[in-house]
Amino acid sequence: MKEIEKLKEEYPLLNKLIEIEEVFWVNPNMEKYETAIKDSPLSEENVKDAEERLKRFASYIAKVFPETKDTGGIIESPLVKIPSMKQSLEKNYEQPILGELLLKCDSHLPISGSIKARGGIYEVLKHAEQLALQQGMLTEEDDYSILDSDTCREFFATYSIAVGSTGNLGLSIGIMSAKLGFNVTVHMSADAKQWKKDLLRSKGVNVIEYEADYSKAVEEGRRQADADPSCYFVDDENSHDLFLGYAVAASRLQKQLEELEIIVDEEHPLFVYLPCGVGGGPGGVAFGLKLLYKDNVHCFFAEPTHSPCMLIGLMTGLHDKIAVQDIGIDNVTDADGLAVGRPSGFVGKTMEPFLSGNYTVSDEELYRLLKELADTENIYLEPSALAGMIGPVKVCKEDAYLQEQQLMEKMKKGTHIVWGTGGSMVPEDVMNGYYKTGEALTILEK
Protein backbone atom coordinates (compact mmCIF):
# COMPACT_ATOMS: atom_id res chain seq x y z
CA MET A 1 0.00 0.00 0.00
CA LYS A 2 1.17 3.55 -0.70
CA GLU A 3 2.62 5.18 2.36
CA ILE A 4 -0.08 6.89 4.40
CA GLU A 5 1.67 10.28 4.09
CA LYS A 6 1.61 9.99 0.30
CA LEU A 7 -2.09 9.11 0.39
CA LYS A 8 -2.79 12.14 2.59
CA GLU A 9 -1.01 14.41 0.11
CA GLU A 10 -2.93 12.93 -2.82
CA TYR A 11 -6.30 12.92 -1.03
CA PRO A 12 -6.39 15.87 1.41
CA LEU A 13 -9.88 14.83 2.61
CA LEU A 14 -8.18 11.90 4.38
CA ASN A 15 -6.81 14.35 6.94
CA LYS A 16 -10.35 15.31 7.96
CA LEU A 17 -11.39 11.66 8.11
CA ILE A 18 -8.41 10.87 10.35
CA GLU A 19 -9.46 13.75 12.62
CA ILE A 20 -12.92 12.07 12.85
CA GLU A 21 -14.55 15.12 11.29
CA GLU A 22 -17.71 14.88 9.20
CA VAL A 23 -16.98 15.08 5.46
CA PHE A 24 -18.93 15.21 2.20
CA TRP A 25 -17.31 13.63 -0.86
CA VAL A 26 -18.46 13.89 -4.48
CA ASN A 27 -17.42 10.85 -6.52
CA PRO A 28 -15.11 12.00 -9.36
CA ASN A 29 -15.38 8.56 -11.00
CA MET A 30 -19.12 8.59 -11.57
CA GLU A 31 -20.04 7.97 -15.20
CA LYS A 32 -23.18 8.38 -17.27
CA TYR A 33 -25.44 5.35 -16.79
CA GLU A 34 -25.08 4.05 -20.37
CA THR A 35 -21.27 3.98 -20.02
CA ALA A 36 -21.26 2.56 -16.49
CA ILE A 37 -23.62 -0.33 -17.22
CA LYS A 38 -21.47 -1.62 -20.11
CA ASP A 39 -18.69 -2.70 -17.74
CA SER A 40 -20.93 -3.84 -14.89
CA PRO A 41 -20.48 -7.46 -13.71
CA LEU A 42 -24.25 -7.60 -13.06
CA SER A 43 -27.23 -6.78 -15.24
CA GLU A 44 -30.96 -6.19 -15.24
CA GLU A 45 -31.49 -9.90 -16.05
CA ASN A 46 -29.75 -10.87 -12.79
CA VAL A 47 -32.08 -8.63 -10.78
CA LYS A 48 -35.18 -9.91 -12.63
CA ASP A 49 -34.10 -13.49 -11.91
CA ALA A 50 -33.90 -12.66 -8.18
CA GLU A 51 -37.31 -11.00 -8.31
CA GLU A 52 -38.87 -14.08 -9.95
CA ARG A 53 -37.31 -16.38 -7.35
CA LEU A 54 -38.80 -14.31 -4.51
CA LYS A 55 -42.20 -14.58 -6.21
CA ARG A 56 -41.85 -18.39 -6.38
CA PHE A 57 -41.15 -18.44 -2.64
CA ALA A 58 -44.03 -16.09 -1.74
CA SER A 59 -46.53 -18.86 -0.92
CA TYR A 60 -43.99 -20.49 1.43
CA ILE A 61 -43.13 -17.17 3.13
CA ALA A 62 -46.82 -16.31 3.61
CA LYS A 63 -47.37 -19.73 5.21
CA VAL A 64 -44.45 -19.77 7.65
CA PHE A 65 -44.37 -16.05 8.47
CA PRO A 66 -48.03 -15.04 9.01
CA GLU A 67 -46.98 -11.37 9.32
CA THR A 68 -46.42 -11.43 5.52
CA LYS A 69 -49.90 -12.80 4.70
CA ASP A 70 -51.35 -9.39 3.83
CA THR A 71 -48.65 -8.81 1.21
CA GLY A 72 -48.97 -12.36 -0.17
CA GLY A 73 -45.57 -13.45 1.12
CA ILE A 74 -43.72 -10.51 -0.41
CA ILE A 75 -41.37 -8.95 2.17
CA GLU A 76 -41.80 -5.20 1.73
CA SER A 77 -41.78 -1.99 3.76
CA PRO A 78 -43.75 1.30 3.70
CA LEU A 79 -42.58 4.49 2.00
CA VAL A 80 -43.81 7.50 3.99
CA LYS A 81 -43.67 11.28 3.69
CA ILE A 82 -41.99 12.96 6.69
CA PRO A 83 -42.86 16.68 6.37
CA SER A 84 -42.49 17.47 10.11
CA MET A 85 -38.99 15.95 10.17
CA LYS A 86 -38.14 17.98 7.07
CA GLN A 87 -39.18 21.20 8.84
CA SER A 88 -37.16 20.21 11.88
CA LEU A 89 -34.03 19.53 9.78
CA GLU A 90 -34.40 22.87 8.00
CA LYS A 91 -34.73 24.69 11.31
CA ASN A 92 -31.97 22.85 13.20
CA TYR A 93 -29.41 23.04 10.39
CA GLU A 94 -30.54 26.42 9.04
CA GLN A 95 -30.66 24.91 5.58
CA PRO A 96 -33.68 24.80 3.26
CA ILE A 97 -34.24 21.35 1.74
CA LEU A 98 -35.52 21.74 -1.80
CA GLY A 99 -37.95 18.99 -2.79
CA GLU A 100 -40.05 16.50 -0.83
CA LEU A 101 -38.62 14.27 1.93
CA LEU A 102 -39.64 10.62 2.38
CA LEU A 103 -38.51 7.72 4.55
CA LYS A 104 -38.25 4.15 3.27
CA CYS A 105 -39.07 2.13 6.37
CA ASP A 106 -36.94 -1.00 5.97
CA SER A 107 -36.77 -0.67 9.75
CA HIS A 108 -40.27 -2.18 9.63
CA LEU A 109 -39.66 -4.99 7.15
CA PRO A 110 -41.37 -8.16 8.40
CA ILE A 111 -39.41 -11.17 9.71
CA SER A 112 -36.18 -9.46 10.78
CA GLY A 113 -36.90 -5.72 10.91
CA SER A 114 -34.05 -4.40 8.80
CA ILE A 115 -32.83 -3.96 5.21
CA LYS A 116 -30.97 -7.26 5.69
CA ALA A 117 -34.33 -9.05 5.41
CA ARG A 118 -33.94 -8.39 1.67
CA GLY A 119 -30.53 -9.77 0.78
CA GLY A 120 -30.10 -12.19 3.67
CA ILE A 121 -33.41 -13.96 3.26
CA TYR A 122 -33.03 -14.04 -0.53
CA GLU A 123 -29.64 -15.75 -0.41
CA VAL A 124 -30.85 -18.43 2.02
CA LEU A 125 -33.94 -19.08 -0.13
CA LYS A 126 -31.83 -19.39 -3.27
CA HIS A 127 -29.55 -21.92 -1.59
CA ALA A 128 -32.54 -23.91 -0.29
CA GLU A 129 -34.10 -23.91 -3.76
CA GLN A 130 -30.91 -25.25 -5.35
CA LEU A 131 -30.64 -28.08 -2.82
CA ALA A 132 -34.33 -29.01 -3.12
CA LEU A 133 -34.22 -28.96 -6.94
CA GLN A 134 -31.09 -31.16 -7.00
CA GLN A 135 -32.76 -33.58 -4.59
CA GLY A 136 -35.90 -33.73 -6.75
CA MET A 137 -38.06 -32.48 -3.88
CA LEU A 138 -39.17 -29.46 -5.86
CA THR A 139 -39.65 -28.19 -9.41
CA GLU A 140 -39.83 -24.50 -10.33
CA GLU A 141 -43.50 -24.99 -11.26
CA ASP A 142 -44.46 -26.27 -7.78
CA ASP A 143 -46.22 -24.34 -5.07
CA TYR A 144 -43.19 -23.66 -2.85
CA SER A 145 -45.27 -23.86 0.33
CA ILE A 146 -44.63 -27.64 0.12
CA LEU A 147 -41.22 -26.82 1.64
CA ASP A 148 -43.03 -26.32 4.94
CA SER A 149 -42.95 -30.03 5.80
CA ASP A 150 -41.08 -32.30 8.21
CA THR A 151 -39.52 -34.14 5.25
CA CYS A 152 -38.03 -30.92 3.87
CA ARG A 153 -36.89 -29.70 7.29
CA GLU A 154 -35.19 -33.06 7.95
CA PHE A 155 -33.46 -32.82 4.57
CA PHE A 156 -32.24 -29.24 5.19
CA ALA A 157 -31.09 -30.28 8.69
CA THR A 158 -28.33 -32.33 7.03
CA TYR A 159 -26.86 -29.04 5.77
CA SER A 160 -25.60 -25.99 7.57
CA ILE A 161 -25.33 -22.27 6.86
CA ALA A 162 -22.84 -19.82 8.38
CA VAL A 163 -22.45 -16.04 8.28
CA GLY A 164 -20.32 -13.34 9.90
CA SER A 165 -22.27 -10.29 11.06
CA THR A 166 -22.42 -7.17 13.23
CA GLY A 167 -26.05 -8.06 13.92
CA ASN A 168 -28.77 -7.43 11.37
CA LEU A 169 -27.53 -9.75 8.62
CA GLY A 170 -27.13 -12.43 11.28
CA LEU A 171 -30.76 -11.93 12.29
CA SER A 172 -32.16 -12.38 8.80
CA ILE A 173 -29.91 -15.31 7.85
CA GLY A 174 -30.41 -16.94 11.26
CA ILE A 175 -34.21 -16.62 11.38
CA MET A 176 -34.72 -17.74 7.77
CA SER A 177 -32.26 -20.66 7.89
CA ALA A 178 -33.65 -21.97 11.17
CA LYS A 179 -37.21 -21.75 9.80
CA LEU A 180 -36.27 -23.92 6.80
CA GLY A 181 -34.54 -26.44 9.06
CA PHE A 182 -30.86 -25.71 8.41
CA ASN A 183 -28.27 -25.83 11.17
CA VAL A 184 -27.13 -22.24 11.33
CA THR A 185 -24.15 -20.51 12.92
CA VAL A 186 -23.77 -16.75 13.15
CA HIS A 187 -20.28 -15.40 13.87
CA MET A 188 -20.85 -12.10 15.71
CA SER A 189 -18.31 -9.29 16.02
CA ALA A 190 -17.59 -7.45 19.28
CA ASP A 191 -19.91 -4.56 18.39
CA ALA A 192 -23.00 -6.77 17.92
CA LYS A 193 -25.75 -5.82 20.37
CA GLN A 194 -26.60 -8.31 23.14
CA TRP A 195 -30.32 -8.35 22.32
CA LYS A 196 -29.56 -9.46 18.76
CA LYS A 197 -27.50 -12.38 20.07
CA ASP A 198 -30.23 -13.31 22.56
CA LEU A 199 -32.94 -13.20 19.90
CA LEU A 200 -30.95 -15.48 17.60
CA ARG A 201 -30.27 -18.00 20.36
CA SER A 202 -34.00 -18.05 21.16
CA LYS A 203 -34.62 -19.17 17.54
CA GLY A 204 -32.18 -22.08 17.90
CA VAL A 205 -29.28 -20.39 16.16
CA ASN A 206 -25.70 -21.13 17.22
CA VAL A 207 -24.06 -17.75 17.98
CA ILE A 208 -20.27 -17.51 18.24
CA GLU A 209 -18.96 -14.26 19.74
CA TYR A 210 -15.64 -12.59 18.97
CA GLU A 211 -13.66 -9.94 20.77
CA ALA A 212 -12.51 -8.60 17.40
CA ASP A 213 -14.35 -6.56 14.75
CA TYR A 214 -16.55 -7.52 11.83
CA SER A 215 -13.77 -8.51 9.38
CA LYS A 216 -12.45 -11.06 11.89
CA ALA A 217 -15.91 -12.59 12.44
CA VAL A 218 -16.33 -13.00 8.67
CA GLU A 219 -12.85 -14.49 8.30
CA GLU A 220 -13.48 -17.04 11.07
CA GLY A 221 -16.89 -17.93 9.68
CA ARG A 222 -15.39 -18.48 6.24
CA ARG A 223 -12.57 -20.62 7.64
CA GLN A 224 -14.91 -22.90 9.59
CA ALA A 225 -17.30 -23.26 6.65
CA ASP A 226 -14.42 -24.18 4.32
CA ALA A 227 -13.64 -27.14 6.55
CA ASP A 228 -17.18 -28.54 6.21
CA PRO A 229 -18.40 -29.51 2.71
CA SER A 230 -22.06 -29.49 3.82
CA CYS A 231 -21.77 -25.90 5.10
CA TYR A 232 -22.76 -22.92 2.95
CA PHE A 233 -21.10 -19.62 3.86
CA VAL A 234 -22.97 -16.37 3.21
CA ASP A 235 -20.11 -14.06 2.30
CA ASP A 236 -21.22 -10.50 3.03
CA GLU A 237 -18.00 -9.13 1.53
CA ASN A 238 -18.29 -10.80 -1.88
CA SER A 239 -21.80 -12.16 -2.36
CA HIS A 240 -23.56 -11.43 -5.64
CA ASP A 241 -26.74 -13.09 -4.35
CA LEU A 242 -27.03 -10.80 -1.32
CA PHE A 243 -26.46 -7.81 -3.60
CA LEU A 244 -29.21 -8.94 -6.00
CA GLY A 245 -31.64 -9.57 -3.15
CA TYR A 246 -31.21 -5.93 -2.13
CA ALA A 247 -31.49 -4.73 -5.75
CA VAL A 248 -35.06 -6.10 -6.00
CA ALA A 249 -36.10 -3.25 -3.65
CA ALA A 250 -35.90 -0.80 -6.58
CA SER A 251 -38.86 -2.06 -8.62
CA ARG A 252 -40.93 -2.26 -5.42
CA LEU A 253 -40.03 1.35 -4.61
CA GLN A 254 -40.94 2.38 -8.15
CA LYS A 255 -44.50 1.07 -7.61
CA GLN A 256 -44.75 2.94 -4.29
CA LEU A 257 -43.60 6.20 -5.89
CA GLU A 258 -46.19 5.75 -8.64
CA GLU A 259 -48.91 5.17 -6.02
CA LEU A 260 -47.88 8.44 -4.34
CA GLU A 261 -47.91 10.12 -7.78
CA ILE A 262 -44.25 11.07 -7.43
CA ILE A 263 -42.56 11.50 -10.80
CA VAL A 264 -38.90 10.66 -11.42
CA ASP A 265 -37.45 11.95 -14.68
CA GLU A 266 -34.94 14.50 -15.94
CA GLU A 267 -36.96 17.41 -14.54
CA HIS A 268 -37.81 15.57 -11.28
CA PRO A 269 -34.56 14.16 -9.85
CA LEU A 270 -34.55 11.49 -7.14
CA PHE A 271 -31.95 11.54 -4.34
CA VAL A 272 -31.47 8.45 -2.18
CA TYR A 273 -29.40 8.32 1.02
CA LEU A 274 -28.22 4.88 2.13
CA PRO A 275 -26.40 3.94 5.35
CA CYS A 276 -23.32 1.90 4.43
CA GLY A 277 -21.38 -0.74 6.35
CA VAL A 278 -19.51 -3.30 4.22
CA GLY A 279 -21.59 -2.10 1.25
CA GLY A 280 -23.88 -4.93 0.10
CA GLY A 281 -27.23 -3.45 1.18
CA PRO A 282 -26.75 0.12 -0.05
CA GLY A 283 -24.82 -1.08 -3.10
CA GLY A 284 -27.57 -3.47 -4.16
CA VAL A 285 -30.37 -0.95 -3.63
CA ALA A 286 -28.47 1.80 -5.47
CA PHE A 287 -27.66 -0.56 -8.35
CA GLY A 288 -31.32 -1.56 -8.70
CA LEU A 289 -32.37 2.11 -8.68
CA LYS A 290 -29.79 3.00 -11.32
CA LEU A 291 -31.14 0.24 -13.60
CA LEU A 292 -34.60 1.81 -13.37
CA TYR A 293 -33.96 5.55 -13.21
CA LYS A 294 -30.52 5.75 -14.84
CA ASP A 295 -29.09 9.31 -14.64
CA ASN A 296 -32.20 10.68 -12.91
CA VAL A 297 -31.40 9.01 -9.58
CA HIS A 298 -28.53 10.21 -7.40
CA CYS A 299 -27.37 7.77 -4.70
CA PHE A 300 -25.24 8.72 -1.69
CA PHE A 301 -23.74 6.37 0.89
CA ALA A 302 -23.65 7.45 4.55
CA GLU A 303 -21.08 6.15 7.06
CA PRO A 304 -20.15 6.81 10.71
CA THR A 305 -17.13 9.10 11.25
CA HIS A 306 -15.45 6.20 13.10
CA SER A 307 -16.01 3.63 10.30
CA PRO A 308 -15.77 5.35 6.89
CA CYS A 309 -14.48 2.21 5.14
CA MET A 310 -16.31 2.53 1.81
CA LEU A 311 -15.44 6.22 1.46
CA ILE A 312 -11.74 5.55 2.03
CA GLY A 313 -11.79 2.57 -0.36
CA LEU A 314 -13.52 4.55 -3.11
CA MET A 315 -11.56 7.77 -2.66
CA THR A 316 -8.14 6.10 -2.76
CA GLY A 317 -9.19 3.48 -5.31
CA LEU A 318 -7.73 0.86 -2.95
CA HIS A 319 -11.16 -0.63 -2.12
CA ASP A 320 -10.70 -3.68 0.15
CA LYS A 321 -6.91 -3.25 0.16
CA ILE A 322 -7.26 -0.56 2.84
CA ALA A 323 -9.00 -0.59 6.22
CA VAL A 324 -9.88 2.38 8.44
CA GLN A 325 -7.45 1.04 11.05
CA ASP A 326 -4.59 1.46 8.54
CA ILE A 327 -4.95 5.23 8.81
CA GLY A 328 -5.52 5.30 12.56
CA ILE A 329 -9.34 5.30 12.73
CA ASP A 330 -10.69 2.99 15.45
CA ASN A 331 -13.88 1.52 13.88
CA VAL A 332 -15.70 1.95 17.21
CA THR A 333 -19.22 3.31 16.75
CA ASP A 334 -22.68 2.92 18.28
CA ALA A 335 -23.98 2.51 14.73
CA ASP A 336 -23.37 -1.22 15.12
CA GLY A 337 -24.70 -2.15 11.67
CA LEU A 338 -22.13 0.16 10.08
CA ALA A 339 -19.14 -0.76 12.26
CA VAL A 340 -17.05 -2.12 9.40
CA GLY A 341 -13.36 -1.34 8.95
CA ARG A 342 -12.75 -2.87 5.51
CA PRO A 343 -15.24 -2.43 2.65
CA SER A 344 -16.38 -5.00 0.11
CA GLY A 345 -14.07 -4.78 -2.90
CA PHE A 346 -16.79 -6.28 -5.09
CA VAL A 347 -19.33 -3.61 -4.09
CA GLY A 348 -16.83 -0.75 -4.27
CA LYS A 349 -15.67 -1.67 -7.77
CA THR A 350 -19.20 -2.43 -9.01
CA MET A 351 -20.70 0.81 -7.66
CA GLU A 352 -17.78 3.18 -8.39
CA PRO A 353 -19.17 4.39 -11.74
CA PHE A 354 -22.78 4.64 -10.45
CA LEU A 355 -22.42 6.34 -7.08
CA SER A 356 -22.89 10.11 -6.71
CA GLY A 357 -20.99 10.47 -3.45
CA ASN A 358 -20.48 9.57 0.15
CA TYR A 359 -20.50 11.41 3.47
CA THR A 360 -19.83 10.72 7.14
CA VAL A 361 -21.89 11.49 10.23
CA SER A 362 -20.96 11.41 13.94
CA ASP A 363 -22.56 9.08 16.50
CA GLU A 364 -23.76 12.14 18.43
CA GLU A 365 -25.58 13.38 15.33
CA LEU A 366 -27.21 9.97 14.82
CA TYR A 367 -28.64 10.06 18.35
CA ARG A 368 -29.94 13.62 17.92
CA LEU A 369 -31.60 12.65 14.63
CA LEU A 370 -33.08 9.54 16.28
CA LYS A 371 -34.74 11.68 18.96
CA GLU A 372 -35.90 14.24 16.40
CA LEU A 373 -37.55 11.63 14.16
CA ALA A 374 -39.30 10.08 17.16
CA ASP A 375 -40.56 13.51 18.28
CA THR A 376 -41.69 14.76 14.88
CA GLU A 377 -43.01 11.63 13.15
CA ASN A 378 -43.29 9.07 15.97
CA ILE A 379 -40.98 6.71 14.05
CA TYR A 380 -38.24 4.94 16.00
CA LEU A 381 -35.10 3.80 14.19
CA GLU A 382 -31.84 2.37 15.53
CA PRO A 383 -28.83 4.76 15.47
CA SER A 384 -27.21 3.35 12.31
CA ALA A 385 -30.50 3.78 10.40
CA LEU A 386 -30.37 7.57 10.87
CA ALA A 387 -27.15 7.97 8.86
CA GLY A 388 -29.15 8.80 5.74
CA MET A 389 -31.30 11.44 7.46
CA ILE A 390 -28.72 14.21 7.29
CA GLY A 391 -28.07 13.54 3.58
CA PRO A 392 -30.55 16.05 2.11
CA VAL A 393 -29.09 18.79 4.35
CA LYS A 394 -25.54 17.97 3.25
CA VAL A 395 -26.38 17.77 -0.46
CA CYS A 396 -28.22 21.11 -0.39
CA LYS A 397 -25.57 22.81 1.77
CA GLU A 398 -22.52 21.52 -0.12
CA ASP A 399 -24.02 22.37 -3.47
CA ALA A 400 -20.94 21.43 -5.57
CA TYR A 401 -22.66 18.25 -6.75
CA LEU A 402 -25.89 20.03 -7.66
CA GLN A 403 -23.97 22.69 -9.61
CA GLU A 404 -21.83 20.10 -11.40
CA GLN A 405 -24.88 18.03 -12.41
CA GLN A 406 -26.87 21.19 -13.31
CA LEU A 407 -29.59 20.29 -10.82
CA MET A 408 -30.03 23.58 -8.95
CA GLU A 409 -33.06 24.64 -10.99
CA LYS A 410 -34.70 21.22 -10.73
CA MET A 411 -34.42 20.67 -6.98
CA LYS A 412 -37.82 22.12 -6.09
CA LYS A 413 -39.43 19.35 -8.15
CA GLY A 414 -37.11 16.70 -6.76
CA THR A 415 -37.59 13.98 -4.14
CA HIS A 416 -35.29 12.87 -1.31
CA ILE A 417 -35.60 9.33 0.08
CA VAL A 418 -33.81 8.43 3.30
CA TRP A 419 -33.37 4.66 3.65
CA GLY A 420 -34.30 3.75 7.23
CA THR A 421 -32.37 0.51 7.54
CA GLY A 422 -33.45 -0.94 10.91
CA GLY A 423 -35.13 -0.43 14.25
CA SER A 424 -38.49 -2.16 14.74
CA MET A 425 -36.93 -5.20 16.47
CA VAL A 426 -35.04 -3.12 19.05
CA PRO A 427 -36.34 -3.93 22.57
CA GLU A 428 -38.24 -1.05 24.18
CA ASP A 429 -35.77 -0.50 27.03
CA VAL A 430 -32.86 -0.32 24.56
CA MET A 431 -34.76 2.14 22.35
CA ASN A 432 -35.60 4.28 25.39
CA GLY A 433 -31.89 4.39 26.16
CA TYR A 434 -31.14 5.57 22.61
CA TYR A 435 -33.82 8.25 22.90
CA LYS A 436 -32.46 9.50 26.25
CA THR A 437 -28.96 9.71 24.77
CA GLY A 438 -30.36 11.79 21.90
CA GLU A 439 -32.19 13.99 24.38
CA ALA A 440 -29.08 14.61 26.48
CA LEU A 441 -26.99 15.42 23.39
CA THR A 442 -29.66 17.81 22.08
CA ILE A 443 -29.67 19.71 25.39
CA LEU A 444 -25.85 19.80 25.37
CA GLU A 445 -25.77 21.20 21.85
CA LYS A 446 -28.18 23.99 22.74
Curated annotation (Swiss-Prot):
GO terms for molecular function: D-serine ammonia-lyase activity; hydro-lyase activity; pyridoxal phosphate binding. InterPro entries: D_Ser_am_lyase (IPR011780), Ser/Thr_Dehydratase (IPR050147), Ser/Thr_deHydtase_PyrdxlP-BS (IPR000634), TrpB-like_PALP (IPR001926), TrpB-like_PALP_sf (IPR036052). It is an enzyme of class 4 (lyase). One of its GO terms (biological process) is isoleucine biosynthetic process. Keywords: Lyase, Pyridoxal phosphate. Its EC number is 4.3.1.18. The keyword Lipid metabolism does not apply. The modification N6-(pyridoxal phosphate)lysine is found at residue 116. The keyword Lyase applies. It catalyses: D-serine = pyruvate + NH4(+). Its cofactor is pyridoxal 5'-phosphate. Belongs to the serine/threonine dehydratase family. DsdA subfamily. This is Probable D-serine dehydratase. It comes from Bacillus anthracis.
